[in-house]
């Protein structure tokens, strides 16, 4: 992870100092999310057949061993240090997830090489993964959708919560938040592939996404 992160048993010392994991603003978003996760527990039900538990799940037509997926990460050297570039990281991640019977979501960034590396890794692993496109302007979304579509992924995602990132909002034309009509247009660009919106923050947002 490089030297940019402070050492702490619970990773809460780097808020607003590191792109991505450090969060933005007052830097409490990830901390509050982690605290909320501590309230969730798995309850065991022993009144059932005494057979091995089946954890498999049908994910958009792809049978996976467990409904747990690797999160999309892009621009590795910008965020996490210089040990892995995007090509190496995606090759390791997508391959390892496919070998484990699950799937990886892959990241995106302002550098075209980020999603190109993701597409190459997905193609190498027979499309076993979900490329995640940031909420760029429609022309760039179209370009990236065509690129990842050639890898025949399970689905395509968009991390719409990235709409507040300054490097997106300051582009010309600007990227960022999307209207319902804009999302409908984006869905059409997926050529029938399932489309997932990551980072919907409210119930009202979820209703509009439907």
Language model features with spans:
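An N-cap/entry alpha-helix motif that binds or orients negatively charged groups
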Residues: 1-64
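Short, charged beta->alpha transition segments
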Residues: 51-61, 90-93, 107-120, 144-146
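Long, hydrophobic, well-ordered secondary-structure blocks that form the structural core
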Residues: 113-139
